[in-house]
Amino acid sequence: MAAIFTEISPTTAWQLVKHENAFLADIRALAHYLDDHPSGAFHLTNDSYAEFLDLVSDEQAVIVVCYHGISSRSVAQFLVEQGFETVYSVTGGFEAWQKLALPVTKGCDQ
């Protein structure tokens, strides 16, 4: 059976970040990331992938967030294929995150 990622709600994602040390990766365009992003999120791009690999530990779950929860699925599946064991995609993306009034940060916090 092929490994797959799991879709989770923004609330569950935030709980995993806060209480389980999950690694949150925002894959939206830089301009949108800088406008605001989930608090603590790393801006993951092709260019920052090597840094991502240095930062994330083998034990950490990785949570991927995009605009609406669509693009994050393909990135989550890519990470599973790269050997990450616990990978999640945020259902509804950053739009849903904002609607739930979960914590956001403006600017760059990397």
Swiss-Prot record:
GO terms for cellular component: cytoplasm. It is found in: Cytoplasm. Residues 18-106 form the Rhodanese domain. Keywords: Cytoplasm, Transferase. Signal peptide: none annotated. The active site is at C66 (cysteine persulfide intermediate). The keyword Cytoplasm applies. GO terms for molecular function: thiosulfate-cyanide sulfurtransferase activity. It catalyses: thiosulfate + hydrogen cyanide = thiocyanate + sulfite + 2 H(+); thiosulfate + [thioredoxin]-dithiol = [thioredoxin]-disulfide + hydrogen sulfide + sulfite + 2 H(+). It comes from the Bacteria. The keyword Cytoplasm applies. Its EC number is 2.8.1.1. One of its GO terms (biological process) is glycerol metabolic process. PROSITE patterns: RHODANESE_3 (PS50206). CDD domains: GlpE_ST. SMART domains: RHOD (SM00450). Pfam families: Rhodanese. Transferase that catalyzes the transfer of sulfur from thiosulfate to thiophilic acceptors such as cyanide or dithiols. May function in a CysM-independent thiosulfate assimilation pathway by catalyzing the conversion of thiosulfate to sulfite, which can then be used for L-cysteine biosynthesis. Belongs to the GlpE family. This is Thiosulfate sulfurtransferase GlpE.
